[in-house]
Structure formats: structure tokens, C-alpha cells
């Protein structure tokens, strides 16, 4: 084992780079005394929950106000001097010190984007110094579970310029023995779907997450297209490939009413509609079926559908343990979406995953619509044995990078690798 001094943080560099939407984001690089280093780039969301940690942006005219030079300066002028000399192996101390220096409930002083970039880069530097893969460093020798992918192949809502209110229509290829076969199934269905859209004269342009963005009239039309594409590719809906939805309901909710497909629905009516979809399609997971602060509605939704499908809180929980505890107490869902930039540190992310696990909730590790080439979430999904990952469609390199990383992890693990779909450890009831 190397001397402890080798793992001390020597310097931290940061810079402004671009994400997949052409918007600025923060990259941090942590250098250790031993010469090892780690780099991380943070993502950014389009449909952001009101309770997410604060992203620091510059304002002004450059990059339409979305520059992050202020966040970069916070790293150079405040975070780096405070962390230099600390052990990179002590992730909790590193993260808690940044939280303490920030001093706000939502990280609005230093910015969650600057804090997270340093947090993730610190973990990667430690893994590199120890010469182990990130998933092994964050996990343990039993971290060998490859996740079921939830593949967003039809985009709507805030992710696409079309008339669909629901944000994501996903494939869940689970009925195989390993991740690589699951990825192959999803890819073949993706190309099958493109062919169908072409034949129907519908757009094959893709949205922010790489899925198609055809101008469909309803969620049912999207569901029918997916079933047709699954069968056209030679697979069995429900048995080999199921469906998942991200309604992102907060985006069309106001004053207790859901403005959905030209109708005004209250919570009970929205729940009834979701229940009909579950009855008519092989849906195994619904994310943000109701709005982020419709707590009473969420409890009713869980009573109605919680024993049938996975009910995932994204905007509801925002990877925050306090909101998750409330959801557990009120029985508001049975799953949490994990987005590292919603909470802003690796330590808090791992705490949320652990709380979910000990409370009988599933966890879905997730990307953001504004992504980068960073593949941390692929390693995180294996490290935590979450069993599920959302990282977009089967196009756009920032999405494919995560899938390719998972292929490499599966190859590294060899016969030790296990696939969550084959073990029934993905979404509920697959």
C-alpha cells in the first residue's frame, strides 16, 4: 500500500467546457501528490425540479447567460485552497467540507456544479492512484451487477420540439442473460423503430437524449409504435422487452390541475389515466407520474399502482435524503431516480442510494438531458448494484459512451458479471 501522503490533494484545476446541448458546463481535474489525477465533467438538466441543488451560471450576454466561469473561479479561489492537503481517499471529509464552506441549503454559494465536479474528480483520482476501476473503488468485491437499461427512444415534453406531453417513452430490454445482449436488443428495436417512422412519414430527427421526436398525437400512439417496433425486431413485448414512461408531470401541472393532451385533469383523474396505460401496455416503470409537490396524489398513486409497477420519484425526491424520507414515511413511491447533480456531491448521492435500499425502494441511476462524455454514472450503477440505468437512446455519443463503458465493465468482470434483468432485479415485476 502506498504511503497515505501519496493520496493528498496537491492541486485542483477547473475549466469551462461544453455539454451535449452546446451549453457551458464545469470540468474539474484533481491532482494528487503521487502524480495520479482524476477528471470529471458535470451534466445539466432541461426539466429541472424546483428542489434541486443550485447550478451557478454567469448571466450576462456571453453564452446567453449560461456561462460557468464564476463556478470555475469558485473552484480555483475557494475550493482548491481548502481541499489541498486533504486525503482524496476521505471522500466524506472532502464533500462535507465543501458543503460547509458553501453554507447554503441548496449549494447556491459555490454552486452545485462546481462542488460536484470536484467531488467526482476526487473519487476518480483516488481510483486511479490505487489502480482500480472506479466501480470497484466506489463499491466492493461484490459490485458485479450490470444494470437493466431504460432506453429513451421516443422523446417528448421538454426534451423535444413535438406535441407529446410525456417526456420519455422507454424500452426496457430485460429478457436476456447479460448486458451486452440487452444492449443489442435495444439497438435492434431502435433501428426497427426508425424504419417504422420512415414508412409512416414521421420525423426521425432525434431529441436531446438521442430518441426520436416524431409529432405524435398521444402517448398511446407512442406506445403502439414501440410495441410494433419490438415485434418487428423479432422480440416479445412484456416477456423480453417491456416499456417505461417518464411523464415529467410537473411540466404540465399548475394550481392542482394537470393540463394533459388538451384536457384538465385532477390528481385522481391523472391516476386513473396512468392506470389505464398500465392495463393496456407492458409498462413496468413510471417516473414522475404526478407533480413534484403533489404529495397527497403520490400516496394515492402508490396505493393504486405501487404493487403493479415501479413508481419512480425524480422531481419528487431530487436525490435528496430529506425528501426521500418524507416519501418513505408517506408511502409516496417505491423507487428513486438518482442524478448526481441534483444533490451535488458523491457522498450525498451514495447516502440517498443507501437510504432507498434499506427502505425497500429501488434506485435508478440516471443521466441528464445535457450530458457529456463523462461515464461516471456507468461505474456508479455497477458499484451500488442499483440494477437499473437511464442513459438515453441508442444514438448521440454522449449517451453511447455510458453504454460502451458498461460493455467494458462486463468484459472486465468476465464470468463474475451478473445482469439484473436475468436475476429479476430491474424494474418491478419484470
Curated annotation (Swiss-Prot):
Binding site for (2R)-2-phosphoglycerate: 167, 339, 368-369, 390
Enzyme Commission identifier(s): 4.2.1.11
Signal peptide (residue range): none
Matches recorded under CDD domains: enolase
Cofactor note: Binds a second Mg(2+) ion via substrate during catalysis.
Major localisation: cytoplasm
Alphabetical list of SMART domains matching this protein: Enolase_C, Enolase_N
Keywords assigned: Cytoplasm, Glycolysis, Lyase, Magnesium, Metal-binding, Secreted
Gene Ontology terms for molecular function: magnesium ion binding; phosphopyruvate hydratase activity
Binding site for Mg(2+): 246, 287, 314
Any one of the GO CC terms: phosphopyruvate hydratase complex
UniProt function note: Catalyzes the reversible conversion of 2-phosphoglycerate (2-PG) into phosphoenolpyruvate (PEP). It is essential for the degradation of carbohydrates via glycolysis.
Family of the protein in this entry: Belongs to the enolase family.
Protein name: Enolase
Amino acid at each position: 500500500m502506498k504511503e497515505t501522503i501519496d493520496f493528498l490533494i496537491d492541486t485542483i484545476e477547473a475549466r469551462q467546457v461544453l455539454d451535449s446541448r452546446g451549453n457551458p458546463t464545469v470540468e474539474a481535474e484533481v491532482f494528487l501528490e503521487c502524480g495520479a489525477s482524476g477528471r470529471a465533467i458535470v451534466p445539466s438538466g432541461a426539466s429541472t425540479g424546483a428542489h434541486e441543488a443550485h447550478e451557478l451560471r454567469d448571466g450576462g450576454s456571453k453564452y446567453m447567460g449560461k456561462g460557468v466561469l464564476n463556478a470555475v473561479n469558485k473552484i480555483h479561489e475557494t475550493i482548491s485552497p481548502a481541499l489541498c492537503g486533504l486525503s482524496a481517499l476521505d471522500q466524506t471529509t472532502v464533500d462535507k467540507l465543501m458543503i460547509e464552506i458553501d453554507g447554503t441549503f441548496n449549494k447556491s454559494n459555490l454552486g452545485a456544479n462546481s462542488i460536484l465536479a470536484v467531488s467526482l474528480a476526487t473519487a476518480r483520482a483516488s481510483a486511479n492512484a490505487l489502480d482500480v476501476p472506479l466501480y470497484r473503488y466506489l463499491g466492493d468485491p461484490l459490485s458485479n451487477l450490470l444494470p437493466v437499461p431504460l432506453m429513451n427512444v421516443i422523446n417528448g415534453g421538454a426534451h423535444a420540439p413535438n406535441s407529446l406531453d410525456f417526456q420519455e417513452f422507454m424500452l426496457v430490454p430485460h429478457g436476456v442473460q447479460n448486458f451486452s445482449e440487452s444492449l443489442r436488443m435495444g439497438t435492434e428495436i431502435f433501428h426497427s423503430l426508425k424504419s417504422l417512422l420512415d414508412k409512416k412519414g414521421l420525423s426521425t430527427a432525434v431529441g436531446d437524449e438521442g430518441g426520436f421526436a416524431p409529432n405524435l398525437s398521444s402517448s398511446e400512439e407512442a406506445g403502439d409504435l414501440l410495441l410494433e417496433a419490438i415485434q418487428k425486431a423479432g422480440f416479445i413485448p412484456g416477456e423480453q422487452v417491456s416499456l417505461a414512461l417518464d411523464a415529467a408531470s410537473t411540466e404540465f401541472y399548475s394550481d392542482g390541475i394537470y393540463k394533459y393532451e388538451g384536457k384538465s385533469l385532477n390528481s385522481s383523474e391523472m391516476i386513473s389515466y396512468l392506470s389505464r396505460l398500465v392495463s393496456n401496455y407492458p409498462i413496468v416503470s413510471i417516473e414522475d407520474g404526478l407533480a413534484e409537490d403533489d404529495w397527497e396524489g403520490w400516496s394515492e398513486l402508490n396505493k393504486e399502482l405501487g404493487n403493479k409497477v415501479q413508481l419512480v420519484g425524480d422531481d419528487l425526491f431530487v436525490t435528496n435524503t430529506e425528501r426521500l424520507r418524507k416519501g418513505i414515511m408517506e408511502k409516496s413511491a417505491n423507487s428513486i431516480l438518482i442524478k448526481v447533480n441534483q444533490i451535488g456531491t458523491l457522498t450525498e448521492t451514495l447516502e440517498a442510494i443507501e437510504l432507498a435500499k434499506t427502505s425497500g425502494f429501488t434506485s435508478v441511476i440516471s443521466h441528464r438531458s445535457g450530458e457529456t462524455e463523462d461515464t461516471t454514472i456507468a461505474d456508479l450503477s455497477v458499484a451500488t448494484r442499483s440494477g437499473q440505468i437511464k442513459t438515453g437512446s441508442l444514438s448521440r455519443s454522449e449517451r453511447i459512451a455510458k453504454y460502451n463503458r458498461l460493455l467494458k465493465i462486463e468484459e472486465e468482470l468476465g464470468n463474475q458479471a451478473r445482469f439484473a434483468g436475468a436475476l429479476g432485479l430491474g424494474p418491478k415485476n419484470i
